Regions:
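Basic, short loop/linker segments at the boundary and entry of helix-turn-helix/winged-helix-like folds
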Residues: 1-12, 146
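Short, conserved catalytic/metal-binding motifs centered on acidic residues
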Residues: 12-13, 27, 47, 51, ...
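Short capping segments at the starts of secondary-structure elements
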Residues: 17-23
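DNA-recognition alpha helix
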Residues: 24-39
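Short acidic, glycine/serine/threonine-rich loops at helix termini
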Residues: 39-40, 102-108, 133-137
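Major-groove recognition helix of helix-turn-helix-like DNA-binding domains
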Residues: 40-57
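Active-site-proximal, Lys/Arg-enriched surface segment
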Residues: 52-124
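Electropositive, glycine- and tryptophan-enriched low-complexity nucleic-acid-binding patches
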Residues: 112-163
């Protein structure tokens, strides 16, 4: 049994994300922080190396569970519809939003349709508030329509859980 459980690794990573930190190395800022540990119910905060290795090993395996949990959370939120003379409608905004990762050597970075090097993730936001319902990281070279029907089908299935 590992000294640092997979649960502690995942909770530590979620803790980083909630704090707006996305680099594995930033976990080092919280390794000796008792409040971080207690607030997340973690026995041991992993090192940056352990966090990176475990998350890389689990790549993609948590995607469905995370999206389902997000849908459950959003199902409890008061989503504001858009009112028109024909009735109320829950807005769903879907967009490919290229990220500028110029001068990096990250895997998947490529020339986007905006003419910069980066990724071309797809996002789906719901409600007038614009809560994130679904997302998909895509290589920068991927055409914006490739995989879109599948992304929309997944998004509509998640949306059905909210309404």
């Amino acid at each position: 049994e590992p000294k640092i459980t997979n649960g502690d690794v995942v909770r530590s990573y979620f803790g980083l994300l909630v704090l707006g930190r996305t680099a594995y190395e930033e976990i080092e800022l919280y390794r000796a922080n008792g409040f971080f540990r207690r607030a997340l119910g973690i026995r041991r905060v992993p090192s940056a190396e352990t966090l990176r290795q475990r998350m890389d090993r689990a790549a993609g395996r948590f995607d469905i569970a995370i999206k389902e949990a997000n849908a459950v959370l959003l199902g409890g939120a008061a989503l504001t519809p858009v009112k028109t003379e024909l009735g109320e409608y829950l807005p769903l905004d879907v967009d490919v939003s290229p990220f500028d990762n110029s001068k990096t050597h990250k895997e998947g970075v490529g020339r986007t349709y905006k003419g910069m090097d980066g990724y071309a993730p797809n996002f789906a936001y719901v409600g007038a508030e614009g809560y994130l319902l679904n997302c998909e990281l895509r290589p920068g070279t991927q055409h914006c329509q490739k995989g879109t029907p599948e992304f929309l089908a997944e998004t509509f299935a998640l949306l059905a859980r909210l309404t």
